A protein has these predicted regions:
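Short, amphipathic alpha-helical interaction segments positioned at domain boundaries
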Residues: 516-539, 591-594
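Accessory beta->alpha helical hairpin/"wing" motif in late/C-terminal subdomains of nucleic-acid enzymes
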Residues: 502-521, 576-583, 681-682
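Helicase motor core with emphasis on the C-terminal RecA-like subdomain
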Residues: 22-27, 59-60, 70-73, 80-158, ...
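Interdomain "pre-motor" coupling segment immediately N-terminal to P-loop NTPase/helicase cores
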Residues: 2-6, 11-16, 20-21
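Short, charged/polar, Gly/Pro-enriched secondary-structure boundary elements
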Residues: 258-261, 515-522, 585-588, 689-694
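C-terminal effector modules of nucleic-acid-centric enzymes and ribosome-associated factors
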Residues: 397, 415, 419-426, 432-444, ...
Length: 755
């Protein structure tokens, strides 16, 4: 079935519109005269709303500030105009960096460097950048003559702490401001915890607090950004949210049903398209017809999908003798290829569309996009909100198109297909986004892998530290406050067993032989896991890299950089794969973990099934999916029933998030029942409904399960970078807090029993 014509996406309330805590002020008047002159030279008639609101509290320098606004709303200048004023007003002659700006991506740093260069040159303020692609000579000059503004990634700041530990205090002694760019990208992540720890250690080193400024996309819950900016909340923080200015959002969700996957069986024609390719053609046609002639971003959830879609759209252009307008963009493409795509997007006179993963989700400067498209269910509400923010700049509406495909209903489809769960989850996320809700970070995460990295880094920086002082730095006053003293001691013992740390005669913790090797390896500075990657080479040119965690062999086909390749040779020692152009191809199976779905999303799905209204942004195809899903939901009486018999399996419907489902699954596993999660339900193998009802009643009577008991039944526990150094006891502790939610799982069962 094809979608209805694209038409004009429906207008809905703006999900990013908000008001500021601090009212508008004559901020321009309080800027330094040289900064005012620079503003005049830019030809600005007025400061933008977010700049008016942010300048006074940043100039006050007596609090942290979170500046929240949509992409291209002027957040960078909102931070740097008052910071530049403060630097020009200073009388101190101490050498050192005065502003530290941390960004999650090298490309963002390069963008900011170009953007700030004119301002800094005009004001005679030094501007430095430090990341993996910056030359050693440029890095060296910054260390020899530190001053002004330093733009840096968390990994390069980590390297600076390790390699220049004795110089850190002098390099940052005059520091008067810390900027965290794209703050929302750090919330709840390993890198976010790493950054919190690094900034805490930096303030301990220079022995004073430094005002922090977080620049973030529009937030559903601003308090999340406050806690991400400074972990302890012991300093006041002002939230500055830009006025939405009446901006509208145009939104359309297109629904598709794939063609019968069995209709081509028995065909012997070599020219016949494989079923998985034919099934995507309707979405490809919709994209091609709608997006041609302008600049857009199309987000797909996997790099393999990106390659397939980019390849199909490129071939459509070739078939119609048109210049190509569609290019892939993902993290495993080479820097040169990614920069070529970004440059094409910036060209206003030439249409260009990037098919991308989350690589273009953050604020890399690519100019104004006419619209954003999402293929399939978005990974989270937060990601959808951020992706929406990439369109609708400079007063024009934000335009979002979503394309969701469900399977044709045959006698063999699962209940997930009958209920159209992919579609309903997408609608639930859109509705929550429109209500300005976003996922909070998972609570109770210990981040033990990151703690291992930070402890080793601190030992490299200082040369050694007493155990009680390390506990104070990281757990008592630092961001790892969820770890008790006894478990911290266990962590030290675990690291000592692996020869990572040892103690001097006076008890001082120092790096041991293996610890020295780990810290000195170039991969140490990243807190997250970095899989083994191979370079992809054709005719001597590097196309990009591929994380290889699946079998490969010469003669195998790949899709990469939007083109089809055949593997000629695999050089294991050199970590290289030699390719030649080919007519066939399958997408490489890039690795990557899916997002966890929050309780609120599943509860919104349940409410949608039971409702009668039709969201105004659904096209005819999407409305059909809505009707089909609701019809089957009511036929199965799932508004009341939670257990269904399907052959030898029992389906348990909970309508809760993944943490609750994981908890219930391993609670059942602990009782000897094989249980598997499938979207918002659990499949219990070789069971009958009456015996499951009895077991769940016993669970409710017993009370919430013990999370450490559940953790012992998890087979794969070493999922993060430094987990191999930790004992089973600490891994179980990490799992108990990270994966399970016993109280919510028990309450969900109790409500099920009561209904």
């Amino acid at each position: 079935m094809t979608s209805a014509s694209d038409g004009v996406p429906a207008r809905v309330a703006n999900p990013v519109e908000s008001s500021a805590e601090c009212g508008p002020s004559n901020a321009f008047a309080v800027l330094h005269p040289q900064v005012q002159r620079w503003v005049w030279e830019q030809g600005w008639a007025t400061l933008r709303d977010v700049q008016e609101r942010a300048i006074p509290p940043i100039l006050a320098a007596d609090r942290d500030v979170v500046v929240s606004a949509a992409t291209a709303a002027g957040k960078t200048e909102a931070a740097y105009l008052p910071l530049a004023t403060r630097l020009l007003q200073e009388t101190s002659t101490i050498m050192g960096f005065r502003v530290l700006s941390v960004s999650p991506l090298k490309a963002l740093i390069n963008d900011q460097y170009d953007r700030l260069q004119g301002l800094c040159e005009r004001l005679d303020l030094p501007l430095h950048r430090r990341h993996g692609d910056v030359s050693a000579s440029e890095k060296g000059r910054a260390i020899k003559e530190p001053g002004g503004v330093l733009l840096i990634t968390p990994e390069s700041l980590e390297a600076l702490m390790v390699l220049r530990g004795s110089q850190v205090a002098s390099l940052f002694q005059p520091l008067c401001g810390i900027v965290v760019d794209e703050l929302h990208a750090f919330i709840g992540t390993e890198r976010g915890m790493q950054l919190q720890s690094l900034l805490h250690r930096l303030e301990l080193t220079i022995r004073r607090r430094v005002p922090r400024i977080g620049l973030s996309a529009t937030l559903g819950e601003p308090g999340l950004a406050v806690r991400a900016l400074r972990h302890d909340g012991r300093w006041p923080c002002q939230i500055v949210q830009a006025d939405g200015g009446g901006q509208t959002v145009r939104l359309k969700l297109h629904g598709f049903i794939e063609r019968d996957p069995f209709r081509q069986r028995g065909s012997s024609s070599e020219d016949e398209k494989p079923p998985h390719e034919e099934n995507q053609d309707e979405i490809i046609t919709a994209l091609f017809q709608t997006l041609r002639g302008d600049s857009h971003l199309v987000f797909a959830n996997a790099r393999g999908t990106v390659e397939i879609i980019a390849d199909k759209l490129r071939r459509r252009c070739e078939d119609q003798h048109l210049p190509n307008e569609f290019w892939p963009h993902h993290g495993n493409l080479s820097k040169a290829i990614r920069e070529d795509v970004e440059a094409a997007l910036k060209q206003r006179d030439t249409p260009a569309t990037a098919i991308c993963t989350s690589t273009l989700e953050l604020g890399i400067d690519i100019g104004q996009m006419a619209s954003v498209a999402q293929i399939g269910c978005p990974p989270s509400v937060a990601a959808l909100r951020q992706r929406l923010g990439r369109s609708g700049r400079r007063g024009s509406p934000s335009v979002l198109r979503l394309y969701v495909q469900e399977r044709a209903l045959t006698p063999l489809v699962s209940v997930v297909d009958l209920l159209r769960m992919r579609f309903f989850q997408t609608v639930a996320m859109v509705n929550l986004m429109l209500r300005r809700w976003t996922e909070p970070p998972r609570p109770n995460r210990l981040h033990l892998s990151t703690l291992v990295q930070q402890l080793l880094s601190l030992l490299a920086q200082r040369g050694g530290i007493q155990p009680h002082e390390a506990w104070r730095v990281f757990c008592q006053t630092g961001p790892f406050h969820g770890l008790g003293n006894n478990h911290f001691k266990q962590l030290l013992r675990d690291l000592a067993k692996h020869d990572l740390i040892t103690q001097d005669h006076d008890g001082t913790l120092v790096l041991a032989a293996m610890g020295e090797r780990v810290v000195n390896h170039y991969t140490f500075y990243a807190a997250f896991q970095t899989p083994e990657e191979y370079r992809l080479i054709s005719n001597g040119k590097t196309l990009g890299t591929l994380p290889v965690d699946f079998p490969l062999a010469p003669g195998q086909m790949l899709l990469f950089a939007g083109k089809r390749w055949q593997i000629l040779e695999i050089n294991e020692k050199g970590r290289a794969i030699i390719l030649t152009p080919s007519q066939g191809g399958q997408p490489p199976l890039f690795s990557g973990n899916g997002a966890w779905i929050h309780d609120a999303v599943r509860q919104e799905m349940f409410a949608l099934y039971g409702a009668d209204d039709v969201p105004p942004y659904l096209d005819a195809g999407a409305q059909r999916l809505l009707v089909e899903g609701r019809d089957h939901f009511r036929r199965l009486d799932l508004g009341r029933v939670r257990l269904l018999q399907e052959g030898t399996e029992v389906l348990l419907f909970v309508w809760q998030g993944d943490r609750v489902l994981h908890t219930l699954r391993f609670w059942l596993v602990a009782e000897g029942i094989k249980a598997n999660q499938e979207w918002t339900l659990l499949r219990l193998d070789k069971c009958k409904v009456p015996e499951v009802e009895a077991l769940l009643s016993r669970f409710v009577a017993h009370g919430p399960p013990e999370p450490l008991t559940l953790a012992r039944h998890v087979a794969i526990k070493k999922t993060e970078k430094h987990h191999p150094y930790l004992s089973e006891e600490l891994l179980d502790l990490e799992l108990a807090g990270n994966v399970f939610d016993p109280q919510s799982a028990w309450e969900a069962l109790r409500k099920t029993q009561a209904s």
